[in-house]
Amino acid sequence: TTDAAVVCGPAAWHHGWKRNDWDALAGAVAAGHGIECGTQATGGNYSFFTEVPGMERVGFPWAEIAQDGSTVFGKHDGTGGEVSIGTITSQLLYEIGGPEYFGPDVTTRFDTIELEQQGPDRVHMHGGKGEPPPETLKVCINRPGGFRNEMSVCLTGIDIEAKAKLIEDAFWEACPYGPDDFEFLKIRLVRTDEPNPETNEQ
């Protein structure tokens, strides 16, 4: 399975799509990619996060997928963060290597997607085109890691120090314990970014 399959599968079942309904499947994959990392779509992966209200308690996104694969993104009213063309674009560009987004069901052409703001915290995504899936896919293997817990947060965009501080403050606000309640605690910011990157990987 893939992250986006959690959304694509139910949409395909609900709408009765065939395995070669490439455009509809591509729309659902793009919708799944849009919400697969939760609050990254509502401001958590946005370079201009300092302009987004309520980042200390960001609302989770949702996606309404239509019969043709077009989608309306939104979030619950009264929660922090925002759903905008900027926040959705930032998430759609996350972890893609190029305009062709390969999946087990369809290859989604991210260079065909169009976004329109439909109102506060509502973005309409449409126009996405799909092609047959590739012959091969990558594989992930996981294993248990013991009794210790480690949390990593990948930060992208500008103002990395400010974003790291925001995330740390939000974590302790939500955590029922304080730093002194732990036997061992280490928080550090590891920088691997480049001042003037030439590639997406940098």
Identify what each model region corresponds to.
Residues 9-21:
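A glycine- and small-aliphatic-rich helix-loop capping segment at beta-alpha/alpha-beta transitions
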Residues 18, 50, 87, 108, ...:
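Generic preference for flexible, low-structure residues
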Residues 16-18, 53, 82-83, 92-93, ...:
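Short, low-complexity, polar/charged sequence segments that are solvent-exposed and flexible
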Residues 23-132, 148:
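A conserved active-site cap/scaffold subdomain adjacent to cofactor or substrate pockets
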Residues 127-201:
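C-terminal non-catalytic interaction/assembly regions of soluble proteins
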Residues 2, 36, 94, 98, ...:
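Short, intrinsically disordered, mixed-charge
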